[in-house]
A protein has these predicted regions:
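Catalytic core of soluble alpha/beta enzymes
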Residues: 61, 66-194
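Buried hydrophobic packing segments
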Residues: 5, 9-13, 166, 191-195
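N-terminal capping/lid subdomain adjacent to the active-site entrance of alpha/beta enzymes
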Residues: 1-81, 86-95
Length: 196
C-alpha cells in the first residue's frame, strides 16, 4: 500500500507540473535501461526450449536447487543469462561458483542462499560470481554491510515502499559502488511501469 501511494503521489505531481519523474528528480537518461524476460522454475530442458524459442536476448532463469549439469548447459547456450537461485544454494555450492572463472558469464546470480548474514557472510564479492542481493536488500538494510559480499542489489519498489525510498537506496548504492537492478514482484503493469 505504501509503495502504491508513493507512486501515485509522483504520478499526480508529475501531471500537475507537466514533467516526468526523471525531470522532477534531475535524473539523466543517456542510456536506456535494459530488460530481460524471466524463465520460471522448470526442468532445464524446458527452460532451454523457452530460451531458444524466445525473441528476447536477455534472460533471468529461476532455480530452486543447484544443478551442475544444468549450469553447464546454460553456460553453453550462447545467450545473456542471469541466474536467480531463490535462496536454494548451499555455502559450498556458492564457494564452488565464486571460484569458477566461468561464473563471470552469468550477468548476475541472484539471492544464492537463504537470507541473513549467517549465510551471505560466506559470499565474496571480489571473486568471479556477480552475487546480487534480493531478499538480503530491504529498505532498512545497511548497504555497507553487504558490500564485501554482493556486487549488485535488486531494488523492488514494493519492498522499499515506493519511488521516494528507492531513490534514497539508489543514492546509497551508488556511493557504495553497487551495480543496481530495478526489479519487480507480482505487481500489475501500473506498478511495474513505475519502476521503469
Amino acid at each position: 500500500l505504501r509503495s502504491a501511494l508513493d507512486c501515485a503521489y509522483w504520478d499526480l505531481f508529475g501531471k500537475l507540473e507537466n514533467k516526468s519523474f526523471l525531470e522532477l528528480n534531475s535524473i539523466e537518461t543517456q542510456q536506456l535501461p535494459e530488460s530481460s524476460i524471466t524463465i520460471s522454475v522448470a526442468p532445464i530442458e524446458e527452460q532451454l526450449q523457452k530460451i531458444t524459442k524466445s525473441d528476447w536476448n536477455k534472460f533471468k532463469v529461476k532455480w530452486n536447487h543447484y544443478d551442475e549439469k544444468a549450469l553447464d548447459l546454460l553456460l553453453k547456450c550462447e545467450k545473456e543469462i542471469a541466474l536467480d537461485a531463490n535462496g536454494s544454494f548451499s555455502i559450498s555450492e556458492c564457494q564452488q561458483l565464486e571460484e569458477n572463472p566461468l561464473s563471470v558469464q552469468f550477468t548476475y546470480i541472484e539471492q544464492p542462499m537463504k537470507t541473513g548474514i549467517s549465510n551471505y557472510s560466506h559470499l565474496n564479492a571480489s571473486k568471479f560470481a556477480n552475487w546480487m542481493a534480493d531478499e538480503d536488500c530491504q529498505e532498512q538494510t545497511k548497504l555497507s554491510d553487504l558490500k564485501s559480499h554482493y556486487k549488485t542489489i535488486n531494488i523492488k519498489l514494493v519492498k522499499t515502499g515506493g519511488l521516494t525510498p528507492a531513490l534514497e537506496l539508489i543514492k546509497e548504492a551508488r556511493a557504495n559502488d553497487f551495480k543496481i537492478m530495478i526489479g519487480c514482484m507480482t505487481e500489475s503493469t501500473v506498478g511495474i511501469s513505475a519502476g521503469a
